[in-house]
Amino acid sequence: MRKSKYLVLNSFYFDFNDDLTEIIEIKSLFENQNILDLFRFDKLISIKESQFEFYNLNFLYLPKNIEIMGKYVFLNNQIQLLDLSNYINLRIIKSGVFSYNQIKQLKLPDNIEEIKWSAFLKNQIKILDLSNCIKLKNIREAAFRENQIKHLKLPKNIEKIEL
């Protein structure tokens, strides 16, 4: 993932805990932003459940060490391109994390293990290539429901796909 070219003054938009591992509060000034740039916050490994839902975000620049994105964290935004391929510590895509967006292009990390219920529900994904996700074992119910998938590639070692 490339670095953001945008200057985002995070102290105007967020309150962090003392060691910068968690966003405590999103300030009202952030409401009109369409870019979330947390790339420089290497200590941030987790984003709380529902923390950025309904913000009309178009672009995400997350810290490379991100491990956990809580359920519904980016629900109902305007994300179109989503490249998570460099987030090697991200093992599970939780329920509803990217539901109700506009995602057309999606790249996941090679070591993703599970995609939970409705993780990418109601997007615009047409080509879904998960063949590089060699540790992917489970795709849960409705994970990609209401997309426009025309071409699908899965890894050979997948164990369970729920419809």
Walk through the language-model features, giving the residues of each.
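Structural signature of tandem-repeat unit edges
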Residues: 1-24, 31-46, 55-68, 78-91, ...
